[in-house]
Amino acid sequence: KLRNQMRAEIIKLRQRINTTFMYVTHDQTEAMTLGDRIVIMKDGFVNQIGTPQDLFDRPVNLFVAGFIGMPVMNFFDGCKLELKDGVYYANVKGVEYKLSDFQQKALKANGQEPCDIVAGIRPQHIRVGEGKLSGAVEVSEMLGSEVDLHVNCGGDDVVMVLQTIDL
């Protein structure tokens, strides 16, 4: 409760003094809620600069993708980027997923050829019954308004977040 109150007070202070405000933190929640722009660093090097939403939606590498978001992004090794009739797909465990319009444009602009990839899927973007991956729920974490499910999908621990109102 105190941390939430302090974040709210810092936001109010920043609005009141109406000036550039630099806040250094290792806490992702503080960075996401307090920052208009965030600088993600590792080992003294800048990995990405962007708005909280940009970092969440379009991480530039695996470090940023795994750092931003709770629970952390699911990573799948041994996947393939495929190109069929001018459309890009990620082949994850034998299942093809059409990439977003943003991803399509970026890949086409770079003339990306099919290749091996590590696929990343946010727990909030996985839906029960909508895909073709199957698995067994091993752990269920009830958090009130949402539930985190840890699902064993062929040896991979896949985390998904469901809103309890949807259950």
Question: Which ranges hold each PLM region?
Answer:
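Residues located in well-ordered beta-strands
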Residues: 51, 63, 77-79, 134-138
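C-terminal boundary and immediately downstream tail of ABC-type ATPase nucleotide-binding domains
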Residues: 58-89
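Short glycine/serine/threonine-biased micro-segments
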Residues: 42, 48, 67, 76, ...
